[in-house]
Amino acid sequence: MGCTISTTNNAPHSPRQEDAPPLPPQTRQSFVGVVNGLLSDLPKRRRRGGLLSDPDISLAGYLLSKAVIGDPVEPQDIPRLHKANNTVQETRARFPYGRGNVATDIAVSDHASSQHAQAAHDVFVDLVRGAAPASMLTNPTLGHAVVSEFVQGGHCAGYAAVATMRHVQKLQPEESVHYVQHNHQGHDWAESRVPDGHHKTIVLDPWAQGPAVLASDSRFAANAQHTQERLALNAKDGDDIAAKTAAGAQYLLENCLPLTETHLKRLKAQEFHCAPEEVWQPQPVVSDAFRRRVRQGLATLTNSSELGLSQSEQSSKALKKMSIKSACALGFGKKAASAAAEDIAAAAYQLGEQSQ
């Protein structure tokens, strides 16, 4: 079940770092200055952002990052990214207490995220030992997704299961969704694929920090040889999965509410905490190599000047134009895109700066 609750095969505190040496001090100072300027009044500007939601801004920031490094997302892939990003956001919304094994969520929730994750695990075990619907047992990923949503708790495996089951209902005929595990890092996520190859694969990792991204840019999925597929579904499975998910949720509501409450009360009374060796620091969805390329690309914009404009004026002008283009690529009008332009630029800087 991925990052499971166990005393064996514990997930590492943080995964292996990629080689990403820091930027030169002068370049980094310039970079950080622009970041601080963009972020200083971000909450106030975001309230005026109009029609772009936070997930839209995050995805537009990724599109901007790709453009900045000279590797823009192909137009035909953007609708799939947008759809996948919506699934990522929908999945995160199903876990109001946060991730059960991520330090920041544990702290904010005062360990409630860990208690709900453990309760979800315990309820699932009880179902396996009891008389759960056959569909929840013959398809463990579906069962895991239904239980995780019901208990509102999980680790990466629960998040990946929910994303997989939600996304299958959105697939076009040529698309498929896959539940994937890393062979070495103890991490699970979902992928949206088309027949064109790995370079078109989109990673849906709601447990990680960031939007849906192309697999080539991701922290865990970039090398397909290091991963294994545990479940594959296509568009024809959508209606069946939707029906079985609804039936499973109804079964839990009618039969498992007292059981769930009992587990949660017990765990709270015991002051259950996730074992320290199983706690992860927040993981960026993108790789260290991608983050470095973004930092370098943005720093190049920051340090360039043309037409007599100052560095800051030129940087602001270029970033705003590219930010507007990124939002328009997601289907937003120019007015909404312009209103959110600085937020999108800030999202790109944050994507480049994400650290563990």
Residue ranges and their predicted role:
Residues 12-15, 24-356:
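A structural boundary/capping signal
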Residues 1-18:
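Short, compositionally biased, intrinsically disordered N-terminal export/targeting signals
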